[in-house]
Amino acid sequence: MSRSEKLTGEHLAPEPAEMARLVAGTHHNPHGILGAHEYDDHTVIRAFRPHAVEVVALVGKDRFSLQHLDSGLFAVALPFVDLIDYRLQVTYEGCEPHTVADAYRFLPTLGEVDLHLFAEGRHERLWEVLGAHPRSFTTADGVVSGVSFAVWAPNAKGVSLIGEFNGWNGHEAPMRVLGPSGVWELFWPDFPCDGLYKFRVHGADGVVTDRADPFAFGTEVPPQTASRVTSSDYTWGDDDWMAGRALRNPVNEAMSTYEVHLGSWRPGLSYRQLARELTDYIVDQGFTHVELLPVAEHPFAGSWGYQVTSYYAPTSRFGTPDDFRALVDALHQAGIGVIVDWVPAHFPKDAWALGRFDGTPLYEHSDPKRGEQLDWGTYVFDFGRPEVRNFLVANALYWLQEFHIDGLRVDAVASMLYLDYSRPEGGWTPNVHGGRENLEAVQFLQEMNATAHKVAPGIVTIAEESTPWSGVTRPTNIGGLGFSMKWNMGWMHDTLDYVSRDPVYRSYHHHEMTFSMLYAFSENYVLPLSHDEVVHGKGTLWGRMPGNNHVKAAGLRSLLAYQWAHPGKQLLFMGQEFGQRAEWSEQRGLDWFQLDENGFSNGIQRLVRDINDIYRCHPALWSLDTTPEGYSWIDANDSANNVLSFMRYGSDGSVLACVFNFAGAEHRDYRLGLPRAGRWREVLNTDATIYHGSGIGNLGGVDATDDPWHGRPASAVLVLPPTSALWLTPA
């Protein structure tokens, strides 16, 4: 019997086992059954359309009705080969016929090189391969537009595309797996350009789940969880900024950062509204950068963005991805750098997201002692798996390239570095050398940092890392992790402990303000007064200050001046720049009304504005932040008076003398050693009346004489206002 004879009548159907897998949604190659297949002098077209009442193949001007065989499978044998093109006309009960190209007529949209690079973990533009991508193909019957879908699920028994386009039916759009790659793929013609979709995954554990696309560029607004097909037609206007970025080294430049939670800065604003209002505010306040709490999509607003489910999608709460691009663009055109918080340490266990994606531990480590973060109830990425490492490294590059982000602040680095992080004895598995270091996480961080700085020169990567791990900001080629900077958590804790004490007791804790200089140049530091310090019952910076409102305001002003004068870059969480009194909550906006009700808030806000202006104009405050040449003590030991004083030096030869009186009383006739005689101008006095202070000071400057003091050749006699900071420069 010839092949053509077999393909008649009941022989149009595939083998029963093949048919059973197709109906069950567990066929690994539905394209091998569906679509057009040539057999000697016949061509068979099969279409799997459950719930359809009629399917017709349109070949040129000819119509061929497909026979319904079983369970929604339709087929017809055409009496010729070399079929060039065709369309399917599908009719559902109660609906008009609609004509579409056959999805199972198209070749794979991924190439062997892409799959090879992914398997090795080295595809630097992986987001262009996996996920959902609108495409067009030219065929004999015209251009076919649609969307190609690709998802990695190597252990799945089957994967189908579901969405609004098919009524979330898991049968009509089964996907094929591309060899040993574990990538399932399908091109679907006429898919809506902003259509919602998920993947129905038949897991290796026998459980069927509907999953959001790990590479989705867009999502439904939470709490809805579907992915959305998204493409960009945004035209950037920040060419000058991007060209300049490639030439910069942020470590040696001014960097004062305003940390923002977009949803509660001013509730109700979209990305494009923020592009106007937030940009104007940051420019007015003089910050050089803004750092956004995680903007990647997250279902639970109470996580502040730190439990991410869609790593490639800006949250849809405030608009589209192009709307987010507009926000970044506006900030760049105003001269503001943009940093985003990035969370590669862990991810939530939501059943529709990454966890046990194909019925096995896929993105997470298979050993529960390594694959779960007990404190947060989340999964930990398997940093040693090439495809997972590629998912994360490519994600970092995606934000830097596709959204022009200037920096990534990597969250919870300590939890990545240590296998025993927050684990009880016996609750962790040592590395191959018997140690507690997570060697795979170390290698991942090194690869991420090296690749990010190679692909996007001039960007900054910042580690939130609170342990003594050595070499966090050391280059990877000499064994470091390769971060540009790390948060100085020790400085933050010591400083806040000190300033929260009554001035009467501060002299006994003077070391808390001097200890940071013992290690200030061991890494490249950011000095954070972040969101973590104004939540969970910690109050606010204002609330930590002792005394009445006048004393609290003076304390906060002196703290901020100390932060900006200390070696390191600055980060300040929103609301603290005007002394917000209520603890922050993501559920409500900042207390902007304080600026209308009391002068203290206005004074603090103006101080921050002036400090930023002075900071940018004085390289002594930033150009040698990471070297001992940029700093020297004038007097570190005046604990009796609660006074600290030091010099800052710039790479241009500039100098700045900084004096801090943390006592509750003023000091008159306070002699300060200086490097040269002559007039020294008071560029900052935090007790000035313009900041709602008491107005005690030095009438704008002092005259230094050739009287040695503090081991220096000259000195000047100053008045130090209570709880204040003075900055002086040669006139």
From Swiss-Prot:
Disruption phenotype: Disruption of glgB is lethal for the bacteria in vitro. Affects the production of both extracellular alpha-D-glucan and intracellular glycogen. Pathway: Glycan biosynthesis; glycogen biosynthesis; Capsule biogenesis; capsule polysaccharide biosynthesis. GO terms for cellular component: cytoplasm; cytosol; plasma membrane. It holds the Pfam family Alpha-amylase. The keyword Transmembrane does not apply. The keyword Transit peptide does not apply. Gene3D superfamilies: Glycosidases (3.20.20.80), Golgi alpha-mannosidase II (2.60.40.1180), Immunoglobulins (2.60.40.10). CDD domains: AmyAc_Glg_BE, E_set_GBE_prok_N. GO terms for biological process: capsule polysaccharide biosynthetic process; glucan biosynthetic process; glycogen biosynthetic process. Optimum temperature is 30 degrees Celsius. Loses 20% of its maximum activity at 37 degrees Celsius and is nearly inactive above 55 degrees Celsius. The active site is at D411 (nucleophile), E464 (proton donor). Keywords: Capsule biogenesis/degradation, Carbohydrate metabolism, Disulfide bond, Glycogen biosynthesis, Glycogen metabolism, Glycosyltransferase, Transferase. It comes from the Bacteria. Its EC number is 2.4.1.18. Optimum pH is 7.0. Cysteine residues of GlgB form structural disulfide bond(s), which allow the protein to exist in two different redox-dependent conformational states. Although the conformational change do not affect the branching enzyme activity, the change in surface hydrophobicity could influence the interaction or dissociation of different cellular proteins with GlgB in response to different physiological states. Belongs to the glycosyl hydrolase 13 family. GlgB subfamily. PANTHER family: 1,4-ALPHA-GLUCAN-BRANCHING ENZYME (PTHR43651:SF3). This is 1,4-alpha-glucan branching enzyme GlgB. The gene is glgB.
